[in-house]
Amino acid sequence: MYIVFYSTSDVFKAEEILNNNNIECKVVPTPVQDKAYCGVCVETHDEQAKTLMEDLEFEVLE
């Protein structure tokens, strides 16, 4: 799943949160061409990731 954000700083906050919780993830280019999102996102296969980032504004793309 791709977790997309409106700001690059949120992408790196999310990556840090996930890494600190031992959830495998990587920062990749956003797969959609939508100017509402920044150019990078977090890719992970762990459903728990969504609950760990409740304080950040994001959307999930499957």
PLM-predicted stretches and their roles:
Residues M1-E62:
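Positively charged, small/polar-rich N-terminal and surface patches that mediate targeting and assembly
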